[in-house]
Amino acid sequence: MKSIILFVLSLLLILEKQAAVMGQKGGSKGQSPSGSSQFPHGQKGQHYFGQKDQQHTKSKGSFSIQHTYHVDVNDHDRTRESQQYDLNALHKTRKSKQHLGGSQELLNYKQEGRDHDKSKGHFHMIVIHHKGGKAHRGTQNPSQDQGNSPSGRGISSQYSNTEKRLWVHGLSKEQASASGAQKGRTQGRSQSSYVLQTEELVANKQRETQNSHQNKGHYQNVVEVREKHSSKLQTSLRPAYQDRLQHGPKDIFTTQGELLVYDKNQHQTKNLNQDQEHGRKAHKISYQSSHTEERQLNHGEKSVQKDISKGRISIQTEEKIHGKSQNQVTIHSQDQEHGHKENKMSYQSSSTEERHLNCGEKGIQKSVSKGSISIQTEEQIHGKSQNQVRIPSQAQEYGHKENKISYQSSSTEERRLNSGEKDIQKGVSKGSISIQTEEKIHGKSQDQVTIPSQDQEHGHKENKMSYQSSSTEERRLNYGGKNTQKDVSQSSISFQTEKLVEGKSQIQTPNPNQDQWSGQNAKGKSGQSADREQDLLSHEQKGRYQQESSAARNIVITEHEVARDDHLTQQYNEDRNPIST
């Protein structure tokens, strides 16, 4: 009697293996539902469990081992069960690898199958053990829903009385029941019970995380990657693609506790610029990008804005300014005072948005925080009156510290603050040069120059982008050269302004000095750094003007500037210091 039972059992095992390998749909109709659990021990004739359908996976670099265990349809504690089940996950993967390697040992109450799936989705949701002979369509393999893997519906429906239907060649699973009691329980239930899937870390999928970060726009593997870094098992009854849909439209997903924001759109970067206006250092995303946006906006000088991280050069805008009248130039610089963090754009978009905001471009400057380029307005501004110039300077008074992008991004936003570009020089810390404004201001009347300088006094420390970037803080204050060039060591750019000053009359330079001086007297607050700036201005600026400009006018200008440095630089430093600190 015993030998007959063994023979029948071995025969059933052979039939089941053939059904699993060939994908037949009727391999186990004649077998008893408890045949897999009656004689689990001591039978070497049952070595077929060890071979376990070694079909090679054609999926990309990974196979999913699904530890399945049975849960009621109405069971709300499956998360708790999944956590309990998680303790044995690593041990089961080891066993599964051993048996997939061809070991002939019998695993008690466990059945494994390697995928024969050609699907690109590496994670397969679960078959339903349905007593009625039909499988739920809701929890089938998402790869089947995508049409990428062979369907296992008919197979699972015919294997409904046994747990060997887990061998369905569309689904790679490992029976998670640690005892025959679960099998008996599953078979005893007339209701459909869901087989939850617990996914485990695969060495190849940690690589997929890197690939998904590189792709940044492809979220097919986001769920797998996210769950694998957290080393958690997926126990949701929902198909995997639903989780992808939840996370797909969002650019933010956590990997290893890091918040990765993938905003490639300029509109998103515009929002970041707005956030900077509120004091958010959103551009601080990667200090490594370190935009050295050197904008030497002198009339003839093309601003080679080197976004070193992105290597784009915005020479065009400066050329446009060449044909503009001096009045326009000053206006444009005032617009910059309004807080052209636009040039900062967003290092992500890496487009150097140079906004030569000509006279009255207040509205443009508001949009400037959004990274829009206001080059068009400059041409329109050509016909504008000097009164418009003063207006944008007032707008700057509102305190656009926008240029203060993020010292980490170290984008040197040069703000061509027209008259009294003290604030620009403050922002010079990122190497932005306010030479342009000085040149522009030359053609303007002393009144106009003084007005924007006062606006700057209102605290355009916006240019004060990031002291870390250590961009040369060359502040070539327009007339009178209040050039409190703190970072004189970095003042390689000051040549331009001096040359431009050569064509200017000496009378113009002292007058704007007075204007700026009068405007700054009322607003000076703290002169902590006055001594340093005076020394730098007195020595370095003189040397620069003498070397950089061969004309005698430049020398005269420096003399006037040096005469007033004591009084002007103190006030100017006082204006900068409270804001910078």
From Swiss-Prot:
Interacts with SERPINA5. One of its GO terms (molecular function) is zinc ion binding. It is found in: Secreted. The keyword Repeat applies. Residues 24-62, 132-157, 173-194, 271-581 are annotated as: Disordered. Belongs to the semenogelin family. InterPro entries: Semenogelin. Residues 138-157, 174-194, 324-333, 366-396, 481-497, 505-529 have a biased composition (Polar residues). It comes from the Eukaryota. Residues 291-310, 334-344, 412-425, 455-464, 530-545, 558-581 have a biased composition (Basic and acidic residues). This is Semenogelin-2. GO terms for biological process: antibacterial humoral response; coagulation; negative regulation of flagellated sperm motility; sperm capacitation. Keywords: Repeat, Secreted, Signal. GO terms for cellular component: extracellular exosome. Participates in the formation of a gel matrix (sperm coagulum) entrapping the accessory gland secretions and ejaculated spermatozoa. Its main location: secreted. Residues 1-23 form the signal peptide. Disulfide bonds: none annotated. PANTHER family: SEMENOGELIN-2 (PTHR10547:SF6), SEMENOGELIN/SEMINAL VESICLE SECRETORY PROTEIN (PTHR10547).
